[in-house]
Amino acid sequence: MAAIGRGRSLKNLRIRGRNDSGEENVPLDLTREPSDNLREILQNVAKLQGVSNMRKLGHLNNFTKLLCDIGHSEEKLGFNYEDIIICLRLALLNEAKEVRAAGLRALRYLIQDSSILQKVLKLKVDYLIARCIDIQQSNEVERTQALRLVRKMITVNASLFPSSVANSLIAVGNDGLQERDRMVRACIAIICELALQNPEVVALRGGLNTILKNVIDCQLSRINEALITTILHLLNHPKTRQYVRADVELERILAPYTDFHYRHSPDTAEGQLKEDREARFLASKMGIIATFRSWAGIINLCKPGNSGIQSLIGVLCIPNMEIRRGLLEVLYDIFRLPLPVVTDEFIEALLSVDPGRFQDSWRLSDGFVAAEAKTILPHRARSRPDLMDNYLALILSAFIRNGLLEGLVEVITNSDDHISVRATILLGELLHMANTILPHSHSHHLHCLPTLMNMAASFDIPKEKRLRASAALNCLNRFHEMKKRGPKPYSLHLDHIIQKAIATHHKRDQYLRVQKDIFVLKDTEEALLINLRDSQVLQHKENLDWDWNLIGTILKWPNVNLRNYKDEQLHRFVRRLLYFYKPSSKLYASLDLDLAKSKQLTVVGCQFTEFLLESEEDGQGYLEDLVKDIVQWLNASSGVKPERSLQNNGLLTTLSQHYFLFIGTLSCHPHGVKMLEKCSVFQCLLNLCSLKNQDHLIKLTVSSLDYSRDGLARVILSKILTAATDACRLYATKHLRVLLRANVEFFNNWGIELLVTQLHDKNKTISSEALDILDEACEDKANLHALIQMKPALSHLGDKGLLLLLRFLSIPKGFSYLNERGYVAKQLEKWHKEYNSKYVDLIEEQLNEALTTYRKPIDGDNYVRRSNQRLQRPHVYLPVHLYGQLVHHKTGCHLLEVQSIITELCHNVRTPDLDKWEDIKKLKASLWALGNIGSSNWGLNLLQEENVIPDILKLAKQCEVLSIRGTCVYVLGLIAKTKQGCDILKCHSWDSVRHSRKHLWPVVPDDVEQLCNELSSVPSTLSLNSESTSSRHNSESESAPSSMFMLEDDRFGSTSTSTFFLDINEDAEPAFYDRPGPIKDKNSFPFFGSSKLVKNRILNSLTLPTKKHRSSSDPKGGKLSSENKTSNRRIRTLTEPSVDLNHSEDFTSSSAQKSLQLEPSFVGNKHLEDAGSTPSIGENDLKFPKSFGTETHRENTSRERLVVEGSASSHIKIRSQSFNTDTTTSGISSMSSSPSRETVAVDPTAMDTDCGSLSTVVSTKTVKTSHYLTPQSNHLSLSKSNSVSLVPPGSSHTLPRRAQSLKAPSIATIKSLADCNFSYTSSRDAFGYATLKRLQQQRMHPSLSHSEALASPAKDVLFTDTITMKANSFESRLTPSRFMKALSYASLDKEDLLSPINHNTLQRSSSVRSMVSSATYGGSDDYIGLALPVDINDIFQIKDVPYFQSKHVPPPDDRGARMFSHDGAGLSSGAGGLVKNSFHLLRQQMSLTEIMNSVHSDASLFLESTEDTGLQEHTDDNCLYCVCIELLGFQPSNQLSSICSHSDLQDIPYSDWCEQTIHNPLEVVPSKFSGISGCSDGASQEEGSASSTKSTELLLGVKTIPDDTPMCRILLRKEVLRLVVNLSSSVSTKCHETGLLTIKEKYPQTFDDICLYSEVSHLLSHCTFRLQCRRFIQELFQDVQFLQMHEEAEAVLAIPPIQPIVDESAES
């Protein structure tokens, strides 16, 4: 019954708000005194009765007119703002929604500055604004006005924004979609706006969660991007980063992919789950992509530790096809790659992403050849930085470092066919991208993919997986061939242009290579006749059945033409072909464009025209016949009715459009040009130019003619450029770009001139296009010289024109030309004052347009446009910078030096002020300026003098404003444009790309031979490969037999371990030794047996020829210096049964650099703990069962330790004699290929004995940390600086229970295991468990190891044989043989992978590319301008900022701790979250029934004081009514005083209130009380029974409680507040609503209480309530009369007006 009653009552309440009254026309006499007008308006608005709503509406609208007329002036208005607001707020209480809307509008016009807003908020009008937003009564007009008012409040002063309105907006944002609220998007937009202006109030109220929740709700990329960008903006700056919970909030957008059981809403029906999941995938994908498009997003998702990027890549390793499919789409989008079609056929998928595939925009009716060429032909810029390359390189490096390539290998070999195909193409694309844009240290190991190769070659893995791997390798080979070939033109028109350009440049015929195949034929008449017969042309007239391949061969036959062969058969052959091709025959011309043979027929047609040309006089007649027929067809096509003629002639759909190619072919030959002139073809085409509606014919004309010779073709082009329609002029202008990129001969002589003419076209689009093409053309110095020679006017073209003019300064000729006119000095001043800053806007706008949905406003329109259309791999070529152009020559450099420009810029970089956005922009401007200066050798010298590059590097790694780091990455790329710049960055552990764009993929240097010679001359490291490979290298290790790892040495008994260590100690003298003593530890286990012979050979191969062995009898091996003791060590192990913490007393390096030396004995050390923050592992941290060694590894033998220690060096040098077989590093381990150190640390928290899986990693990266080891190092702890990737299923296995304590040491194991690639075991049962276990561990413990391992078959042999196999099993006895078997698959190209590498030749230089010297490419300014830190994690480190709420917890005695304070202290910002102490008093209050039932009831028990009003938080400041009493000094009537003042209660005995003596026990009728106390107090009664309670009368004894006594009013107030507070919880909501409805029904006057309503509004503003609950509560109070507030307004209006001041001023 209660539920039914509730529904009826709410319905009735809603009807009240629907008043469709229109505005009554109320005249406003603006000539009257403004104060009189205002008084009249306010009196009408404030009257409770006697004024219709329509009239009130008119008066409110007059108020806005009056304000607009006289402005904001209390003197003129005659009222204080407080008085005006007290009257205006009554409009918000009106029953008509139109009046409320007008009241909100009036307030919006009134609030002009912070002082007025403060007064509005002081009078608690925000409660009423929130009420307008909350109540849903189809009152969109009112709510729209409320939201507009809210936005005005944000604009005026966001820092004053009230939490009451914020909570209301957030409630709509959270629950609006379920409620079908049409204002939900508007509210979310306002929350975003507010978050940028006042993030604290949004974060405090849980608004950031609302924004992120809506990211997953929204499938519109523009909105989705705006939402996530709001969060990213907060993460960008250290001051606002505190409002976003680290590692929690941003990662929510990953949940649909990383949580397999993700449900966005618990209410989703089972039938809709799949559809809902797809929607979440789409929204999440948009959010992830937008996040990776910003620096804040990249750095937060890629930061070391348990990062979002690791979660994403880790999920690839779990065999869930739906997730894998979705994630692959995300990855394609992140890297801006075209998505292949869904198919099981690799070739079909490959063709779908071929850049040369047909696109709709290439049709004749659309962009045609100009659009196709822009896609296919490369940009002219060879070394101009494309900022998209820098961005993609950074993203790619981060993904590769976190194991993406290995994750893809797992997807390829263990997924459905269509997913496997997509993953293969993605892998190919990423490898291609890595080779093109990644520096050596990030890419030198990518071309091997040992894991995939080993899978394809090893027979130890399942056949299906092996076949998949093999197929993938074949597919990658096909992909490689496609990339090597480059994009081929689709249309014959573009192919024709390119081939002719190549032919003229190389001075040879385009078909020369094809003809080589024909030379083998006997050049005899007999052979020709046989071919004529076989071609079928002479046999029958079925044209399409002729042998067109043979026809083409005959036409290209050397020395065969009509002049040389007079045979009649050849003439018949020609006549038949001529008849077929003539338009009048309607044979060729009527064939469909989509015909399979269409291209071949056209190519043969072009060859036919060339054949007739070569035949000279004999063929002239035939050719003239053909050309005249084409002219006749042309005249007919360009008839009076173009639409009809196009339709009839089928120009758009048939091969007739290819007749223009015949004309184009003729225009390439001098004789052909004469023929075209003779037949009036040029005249016909010239006539076309001026015709309207012939766009298609003009496009074909422009695209077909040859312009390499001066003649009529250029005249036609020039006429089309100037006289044709807008569309044709634009197309012809775009075609000039085609000619530029195709490298048409002498373009600088005539093309530049045509482009300069187009700059003055009246159509801005055309002039802008011409300007863009000129900008590209000026990449070529010849074109730039030609442009300077023409001295064009560019100033009318805005910023782009200015930037093109600045290009003149890069060469002395242009500099002199502009300097003579005083232009240079003016520009230097202009750039110094404003343009350096404007340059930042220019670049960031281009980047935004390329990376986001943002689109540049058109023609000065300020409206920011967004587009859902996805751009195909856009380019952002760096705009020209004044300083960057000047430094190309000595004069310009001198100019910059004289003006001290660089000194000032360096000062800005060294002392940045990051508090204001203006200062951040100033810093960016300085960085861009310095980067441009450093892009030439001249300028670089200036930067070196100032020594500013280290400061830029420091900003790139440590700047707390994350977007500055991004700018630094771009800027350092500019410095890497020259060889000198690359070398400087190399010294600071930044690696650069050392090639230009003119080198096609794959990048192969000219001096490969020299490289090979250098490689072969270097002594080898330990080579883990077959004898044949070793011998090819002439290395010292060639004498090692293939069984070198079958080491057997039983000196230490059967339970000892054979473990390889590689310990490089920089300051120690290199030596090899065996350690006695600790080696005998029983807790160790072996990898394989050993023999002294082989062992010695290994030692020999590992030792430098000039150094001596240290015998095993010398335990000390020479005394180590104290320096040696303190130096950091790099350790690689194949397995570590134990951990030994370095316990040197002098060990003082920073915690981020501590290394663990893994030994069989456990030596805890407190001293190490003191040295830094990395916890040490003491004796109690790891406990091994005594039986561990003997039970598990009975069969195995001794442990050998091999140590290489490099010689002392002032820099951190890594020697080549490293024990390394990493097939992913082309034989260059991270030790021998980078100037960095590697540390291993173990997290004690990760040594949980419940974790049963080996914490291994799979990643194709090599880890390098380039921190110098100083005690002062302030880098973050290892838990942040090291990353771990997940192992794909099958690449690692679960440890047995006995081995669980090994988990932590095994983290370091990974390093060496990564370097030995063997074969997989087939124990599939551990796959899923191991992977899931690792996922859990990653979330629980940030692992502390660097992860550079690969999921290789070899690693699994090691792990499974030594750890998971049973001790006595046959499998474990075969370890050595399996080990060797695996070794045979450990390499792809053994010469590349396992060859010895000399420190001087290949350290930090690309295995293929980096040997290419600048001399190879010529010029110094030749690289693409891209640099990355050797350890990419360097730029992903962020200082932990504590979450802001921890700072706001009030002290225990504070009022805020007692209850809900005004600033919301201590409140949770989570949805529905209440801090426990916030409302504990209200929650602990006894219900009304309990109080009545108490035997010992007394007034003092439930009244807090003798003046208790029943309102816990009521004050004069937070009550709508009382605040005015305080403000006005207004004395309410006696009738009103009883509302709030209860000082008279103490005089009334309790017995009088209750009409019964205190001592009588209170009887309860349970069925009648359960409606309130049972449900409200969370009793076990169910909602259904609660709602069906028959009656909820409150009884005292048998009598009903009298509701007119003060005591009862207080109790009812308390009960209402208690129930309202309970509504903020989602538990038993229906019960609490029923309780409130019952009180409403029995005691309706309870809710007619302004103070109670204010208290409830106060609750609503400081607690989180669901939208449904807010609406329910607001509707309960819709009957409040607010009479007292009307009385206050009347009292205000009764005060005489303030007019003396106005009169005096008027008189004076």
Swiss-Prot record:
Effect of disrupting the coding gene: Mice develop normally until 9.5 dpc, and then display growth arrest and embryonic lethality by 11.5 dpc.
Subunit structure: Component of the mechanistic target of rapamycin complex 2 (mTORC2), consisting in two heterotretramers composed of MTOR, MLST8, RICTOR and MAPKAP1/SIN1. The mTORC2 core complex associates with PRR5/PROTOR1 and/or PRR5L/PROTOR2. Contrary to mTORC1, mTORC2 does not bind to and is not sensitive to FKBP12-rapamycin. Binds directly to MTOR and PRR5 within the TORC2 complex; interaction with MTOR is enhanced by deubiquitination of RICTOR by USP9X. Interaction with MAPKAP1 is not enhanced by RICTOR deubiquitination by USP9X. Interacts with CCDC28B. Interacts with NBN. Interacts with SIK3.
Localization: Cell membrane; Endoplasmic reticulum membrane; Lysosome membrane
Region (Interaction with NBN), start-end ranges: 1-789
MF terms (GO), sorted A to Z: ATP binding; enzyme-substrate adaptor activity; protein kinase binding; protein serine/threonine kinase activator activity; ribosome binding; zinc ion binding
Protein name: Rapamycin-insensitive companion of mTOR
Cross-link (Glycyl lysine isopeptide (Lys-Gly) (interchain with G-Cter in ubiquitin)): 274
Tissues with expression: Highest levels in liver and brain with expression also detected in heart, muscle, spleen and kidney (at protein level).
Bias type Polar residues, positions: 1147-1158
Function: Component of the mechanistic target of rapamycin complex 2 (mTORC2), which transduces signals from growth factors to pathways involved in proliferation, cytoskeletal organization, lipogenesis and anabolic output. In response to growth factors, mTORC2 phosphorylates and activates AGC protein kinase family members, including AKT (AKT1, AKT2 and AKT3), PKC (PRKCA, PRKCB and PRKCE) and SGK1. In contrast to mTORC1, mTORC2 is nutrient-insensitive. Within the mTORC2 complex, RICTOR probably acts as a molecular adapter. RICTOR is responsible for the FKBP12-rapamycin-insensitivity of mTORC2.
Positions of post-translational Phosphotyrosine modification: 1385
Organism: Mus musculus
Family: Belongs to the RICTOR family.
